[in-house]
């Protein structure tokens, strides 16, 4: 069952009663966790209704969950509705001046449990929530008798599934544009980074955990280990641009060293940062590697020879590479890469820090790169 949003005055189990303007049911004002009611409440005097306990949350997705609980059998047959108080868990480190999320009050008819709560307008992926429940009995005159609030339970929503990522992929397909030829992947860093790799890692760049840039629900953020590469080219030269936001030293490696018939290609994300530029994250993983197994379970796999973002085809016995022109590709390679496989040199352009996507937050209002689930 999909639970509609309650658009009436409900109180939180952990806050005083508040007036909330809403839609269609009779005006309801529930009690706070201690059972206190305002004088003008439309709820009848408290009668004994079973209080939900032993609450269980399962089947959690990025925008839904199933909830069930136990109740004493006494007066159970009088229950007509359930009231659910759902709130984002307070983040003590959040900006205290930031607008606070409005608590979500839900109402549902008393249906057999477990009950599915679904709604992308109030549930976001990978977000911690608290939930509490009341049982209620609607009276002939429209008033409600309610139980005390249950205990407060915490849970966290899930990442985007393959289904959601496929929806993002389809949106990215629309704007990818024509394909341009390229021959090298490159990675910019500070000189100190490459010195450290030589001294401490045996001359091989090591995968690291991906940051939280991009879609909030992306299953690779904070989980997938890899090394970021770019492959963009300048339209007039066909070569990598001389500017970079990530450092003045660039490692270049022939495309076939990273992307070839022995690797798999996956779609990871599609996002923008309040600008006209859109980014597509792709993952290249050697077949059978830990990174490949991680992606196979979570990400849509692309045909390396035929997709709208990054291709590897064979022409006259030679591998030929193309990248999309109208999106900026961020390519993650999931295995270590030896510096000896390429070259490191200083770029002649500028270090444009403003273009960095490190921990960049996705614009949740962009219609081009958002789907109808939490952002």
Curated annotation (Swiss-Prot):
Which residues of this chain are annotated as glycosylation sites? 22, 36
What does the entry list under GO cellular component?
A: mitochondrion
- Cross-referenced SUPFAM superfamilies, in alphabetical order? Fibronectin type III
InterPro entries membership: FN3_dom (IPR003961), FN3_sf (IPR036116), Ig-like_fold (IPR013783), PHYHIP/PHYHIPL (IPR042868), PHYIP/PHIPL_C (IPR045545)
Q: Tell me the residues on which Phosphoserine occurs.
A: 11-12, 15, 24
Gene3D superfamilies, alphabetized = Immunoglobulins
Keywords, comma-separated and alphabetical:
Glycoprotein, Phosphoprotein
Q: Which residue range or ranges hold the Fibronectin type-III domain?
A: 51-160
The protein's job, in short, is:
May play a role in the development of the central system.
Q: Which family does it belong to?
A: Belongs to the PHYHIP family.
Q: What is this protein called?
A: Phytanoyl-CoA hydroxylase-interacting protein-like
Q: Which gene encodes it?
A: Phyhipl
